């Protein structure tokens, strides 16, 4: 029986020619010989990036709050990290209440 034979109908031939039983055929094995050739694969190095975020949320008095939340013109974030991201410059600071 050929590997490409279709499933035979189960019982009387239906109008749609469908079958409720699985159709499985075992074909002969195929053999493929692959000769390895020298291949150089270059994987790109990792790209490291960070996006520090300093956010001040305020109202119509945000200009006054902005002057409180900065030191020497550099914004201070509540997490203790300055805009430089080093973390040690403003680590002892606390956020002021609004």
UniProtKB/Swiss-Prot annotation:
Keyword Acetylation: yes
Keywords (A to Z) from UniProt: Acetylation, Keratin
InterPro entries reported in the protein's UniProt record: Keratin
Pfam families the UniProt entry points to: Keratin (PF02422)
Coiled coil (residue ranges): none
N-acetylserine PTM positions: 2
GO cellular component: intermediate filament
GO molecular function, one term: structural constituent of cytoskeleton
Organism domain of life: Eukaryota
Keyword Metal-binding: no
PANTHER family: BETA-KERATIN-RELATED PROTEIN-RELATED (PTHR31203:SF1)
Family from the record: Belongs to the avian keratin family.
Assembly and binders: The avian keratins (F-ker, S-ker, C-ker and B-ker) are a complex mixture of very similar polypeptides.
Protein known as: Feather keratin 2
Organism, scientific name: Gallus gallus
């Amino acid at each position: 029986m050929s590997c490409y034979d279709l499933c035979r109908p189960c019982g009387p031939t239906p109008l749609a020619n469908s079958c409720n039983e699985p159709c499985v055929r075992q074909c002969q094995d195929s053999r493929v010989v692959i000769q390895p050739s020298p291949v150089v694969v270059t994987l790109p190095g990792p790209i490291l990036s960070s996006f520090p975020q300093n956010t001040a949320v305020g109202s119509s008095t945000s200009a006054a709050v902005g002057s409180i939340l900065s030191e020497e013109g550099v914004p201070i974030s509540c997490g203790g990290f300055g805009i430089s991201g080093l973390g040690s410059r403003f680590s002892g600071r606390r956020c002021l209440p609004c």
